[in-house]
Amino acid sequence: MSRQKALIVDDEPDIRELLEITLGRMKLDTRSARNVKEARELLAREPFDLCLTDMRLPDGSGLDLVQYIQQRHPQTPVAMITAYGSLDTAIQALKAGAFDFLTKPVDLGRLRELVATALRLRNPEAEEAPVDNRLLGESPPMRALRNQIGKLARSQAPVYISGESGSGKELVARLIHEQGPRIERPFVPVNCGAIPSELMESEFFGHKKGSFTGAIEDKQGLFQAASGGTLFLDEVADLPMAMQVKLLRAIQEKAVRAVGGQQEVAVDVRILCATHKDLAAEVGAGRFRQDLYYRLNVIELRVPPLRERREDIPLLAERILKRLAGDTGLPAARLTGDAQEKLKNYRFPGNVRELENMLERAYTLCEDDQIQPHDLRLADAPGASQEGAASLSEIDNLEDYLEDIERKLIMQALEETRWNRTAAAQRLGLTFRSMRYRLKKLGID
């Protein structure tokens, strides 16, 4: 079996020699170029499994080489080597299609990790990625989404996944991880809005025994738990400002220090994040740091809401009903034609999650394994009317009407946060005490 090959592009002989020796010890063959012209000539003569290029070259920019390789040799991952502190340059490289980046002086441990990760990438021309049956839909937006997931899986760039609640952002993050070179390492999801602010630093970075009351033993943080894999920051907009500063530093330095610890520990983690909020608007309102926003939003991936892919609803409904039948051991129910039309005309503010909840209820209520329009109870759902408000003639009692709206909104927040009451209260802009009072008043357990 022939050895894998790496192309090294740098005009400094000392750097070239260091990279050649390190990669040679990893059992890689290397070819070296001093500039863009020589690199192109080598690429035209033979294939490479990896390219390491300096940002500044005598006859051009490393960015030009990244773009050239992306167009002519997309199967070859490229890592950019930049000067220390040149984060803007590194982000430019990632946006251009670079797999990852290193800063000078080159950390050899980090270099070896990067090379090992790059070599685990699947060649897109050698095999086609299997279609994952968890991300259903044949509509143009879903086909485009699956294509983007495949491309982003080959990169180590941070990805900001935007989309409405219930649209499947965590599933998309999980697929990016599973289709990439980190698949054998952990995927660690965390709901940023569900962690109490006083415990946040300990949760993310870990703590040492005795560092605070209740710290009876050393604890590993989320960054270390995700080492070598992916850390998914869900509802990242809910992070308090003080934590945003610490998160930014951890991402930039690729190192964390436990609460009560004296030394930083290097971490190799890919960062994916998501929120149902408009993160750019949060920056404009002063609730989210602009520097962290630019660090997280190297590439944005939008997950379409269900109303933008209505043609996928019958397929989704069929799969959900089959799963419900399998879970209960009962025959699968079928949507009538009228019920399908009702679903396709409904706005689904809660997206796929709302569809799942709606069909689970209808499956329980239907007769003869036939789901009729009335089983869906769309008239009671939040998206049944675009105006969302009843006329005066429909309201018998204002207090009962307002209480019903309050109950629906609280239930929706609880479902979207998987019944985490603290997170649901934050989403509704309530204190936990106020949330607890309303739950008791409305009889919600």
UniProtKB/Swiss-Prot annotation:
One Gene Ontology cellular component annotation held by this UniProt entry: protein-DNA complex
Modified residues (4-aspartylphosphate): 11, 54
Function: Member of the two-component regulatory system PilS/PilR that regulates the expression of multiple genes including the type IV pilus (T4P) major subunit PilA. Thereby, plays a major role in the regulation of multiple motility pathways. Upon appropriate environmental signals, the histidine kinase PilS transfers the phosphoryl group onto PilR. In turn, PilR functions as a transcriptional activator by direct binding to a cis-acting sequence upstream of the pilin gene promoter leading to its activation.
Superkingdom of origin: Bacteria
Name of this chain's protein: Response regulator protein PilR
PANTHER family named in the record: RESPONSE REGULATOR PROTEIN PILR (PTHR32071:SF100), TRANSCRIPTIONAL REGULATORY PROTEIN (PTHR32071)
Gene: pilR
Gene Ontology terms describing biological process: phosphorelay signal transduction system; positive regulation of DNA-templated transcription; regulation of cell projection assembly
